[in-house]
Amino acid sequence: MNVIIQKLNGLWHLIVGSCQIRTPFSETQDRALVIAYARRIYPGAKIFERD
């Protein structure tokens, strides 16, 4: 499974397939927090960052 993290409208989002999931992290927070969050929700997934 591939998970893409992306900044949109001031928040980090996870994109899984065609679903866009808003995270509780603002775009000013560290990317490492978002990656840890994604790994906890989707263990074993490949995580990519999109600009």
Regions found by a protein language model. Give the residues of each.
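Short N-terminal "domain-start" leader segments
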Residues: 1-16, 48-49
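Intrinsically disordered, low-complexity segments enriched in polar/charged small residues
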Residues: 11-12, 36, 44, 51
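Short, surface-exposed beta-strand-loop junctions and turns on beta-sheet-rich folds
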Residues: 19-22
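A short, charged, amphipathic alpha-helix used as a generic interaction element across diverse proteins
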Residues: 25-46
